[in-house]
Amino acid sequence: MTHLNFETRMPLGTAVIDQFLGLRPHPTKIQATYVWIDGTGENLRSKTRTFDKLPKRIEDYPIWNYDGSSTGQAKGRDSDRYLRPVAAYPDPFLGGGNKLVMCDTLDHQMQPTATSHRQACAEIMHEIRDTRPWFGMEQEYLIVDRDEHPLGWPKHGFPDPQGKYYCSVGADRAFGREVVETHYRACLHAGLNIFGTNAEVTPGQWEFQIGTCEGIDMGDQLWMSRYILHRVAEQFGVCVSLDPKPKVTMGDWNGAGCHTNFSTAEMRAPGGIAAIEAAMTGLKRTHLEAMKVYDPHGGEDNLRRLTGRHETSSADKFSWGVANRGCSIRIPRQVAAERKGYLEDRRPSSNCDPYQVTAMIAQSILF
């Protein structure tokens, strides 16, 4: 990759934008930023429009269009694609009544594009709504500079071996906390169910958790939290990698996942451990199918991560156990002790599509 000049900045850019973002909000008009998943199935795009007044319901946000030939979702001769708003959140960057709007992407026949999996997920969640499906997803990521070098790593050589970085404190081991704390506050402002955050095992790697969310809300909130994370990183002049195992970490370093916690009302009730253990049958049956949708490249990304080392299971073999982070599915020790609660699917990669992951878990256990 071409090395960029990190000193190339717009003069006084931050001071100027702060001046205008600090202006009093317009008394009636608002800005709505439409956010969508592009043709990669993992990257996000956005564009903003003005409304004369704040829409009261998600249905009041109109369908919009965009150039799908520039996002890997259409050919130039038939490039128009549609954005269908599905969820709106307070905008932590613009404040006031401004909104971030998560959108589905639709083709010229108003059908979901190839990388738009929300509609299929929503149909499944509607079918199982009486089970009260709860999800929580643990998003791991790596903060990198613009030539994809992890924050805190020496330019030549490697940092000290992992061991001192997890949940760490100190300038010699916790790299990028400014991004992490800003993202946390921004998610809270946006009304997302952000549960917490922590430094992870690999230096420069962090995690945040979104949940508890019920049904389709899980996918909407995780995608929007990712968008906010990328925007925050942009303001600090760094980038976020959701690659589950970047080349620089291919040695003795933990990869990045998106462990997904799941429960039903039955699992959360007294004696729910029986339902949790019964779920393993369905999860085992669909293991190979699940591996194909747990990253956006048909399972290829996870092959680099799920090696049976670094707190992972083997990609080609299903396993489960209590408190075992080397299994496909972990039952937390506290859950086993209380005999109710939830299970943790440790297979999804950090760049997974949460719509596909939550739909697969629901199908595996409840269909």
Curated annotation (Swiss-Prot):
Entry coiled-coil feature ranges: none
Lineage: superkingdom: Eukaryota
GO biological process per UniProt: glutamine biosynthetic process
InterPro entries hit by this protein: Gln_synt_N (IPR008147), Gln_synt_N_sf (IPR036651), Gln_synth/guanido_kin_cat_dom (IPR014746), Gln_synth_cat_dom (IPR008146), Gln_synth_N_conserv_site (IPR027302), Glutamine_Synthetase (IPR050292)
Catalytic activity as recorded in UniProt: L-glutamate + NH4(+) + ATP = L-glutamine + ADP + phosphate + H(+)
Top EC class for this record: ligase
PROSITE patterns named in the record: GLNA_1, GS_BETA_GRASP, GS_CATALYTIC
Protein transport found in the keyword field: no
Occurrences of domain GS beta-grasp (ranges): 30-110
Subcellular location: Cytoplasm
Residue intervals passing through the bilayer: none
Lipoprotein keyword on record: no
GO molecular function annotations of the record: ATP binding; glutamine synthetase activity
EC number, UniProt record: 6.3.1.2
Cited Pfam families: Gln-synt_C, Gln-synt_N
Annotated GS catalytic domain residues: 117-367
Keywords: ATP-binding, Cytoplasm, Ligase, Nucleotide-binding
A GO cellular component entry from the record: cytoplasm
Self-association state and partner proteins as the record states: Homooctamer.
Family: Belongs to the glutamine synthetase family.
UniProt-recorded name of the protein: Probable glutamine synthetase
